[in-house]
């Protein structure tokens, strides 16, 4: 059966939904959930359940003291995924905190590392179909190691992994975390382009 050809969205598709009502149905420590009644641009009324989150920061910490860059990866158990995952250091932005301040705090808390040079290199939505969480990936360079202060419920192993090995871990299916995949691939492409 031939597939239907899709045409490009018309300008009218850019209209914003009209929120008719919004009710918080859950409020927790990390996120809340709202059930919103909205009117679509075509006039249809629908219910949208949205997980509300303050946003997250991700730290692409790179050690450049050797022959090739090494990426700081963490290995920790994630209850929701029910497995140990390789990730970049990351965390939630606290109320009233800037993304950069949150990134600096999370890097120290989780790993003990500090960085002298910071630059936001990526910004994206984690899963925009039902979640408003944004993620900012910060490149952190010129690292020095101090003492970590992870939260009581965090058990994190830190590893400096050569970039080629981190790429192999992605392409061999050992890294399942989307933000880690995005950050490591960004670094490899930035180096390839001469932008690093």
Regions found by a protein language model. Give the residues of each.
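Extreme N-terminal tail/first-helix region
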Residues: 1-27
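Conserved Nudix-box catalytic region and its N-terminal flanking loop in Nudix hydrolases
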Residues: 2-4, 14-16, 48, 67-105
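Acidic, metal-coordinating catalytic segment for phosphate/diphosphate chemistry
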Residues: 21-60
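Short connector loops at helix/strand junctions that flank enzyme active sites
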Residues: 31, 45, 52-56, 66-68, ...
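Short beta-strand micro-motifs in enzyme catalytic cores
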Residues: 32-36, 70, 134-136, 157
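Unchanged
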Residues: 46, 56-58, 63, 92-178
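Short helix-loop capping/hinge motifs at secondary-structure junctions, enriched
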Residues: 66-69, 144-146, 194
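Long hydrophobic alpha-helical segments typical of transmembrane helices together
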Residues: 167-196
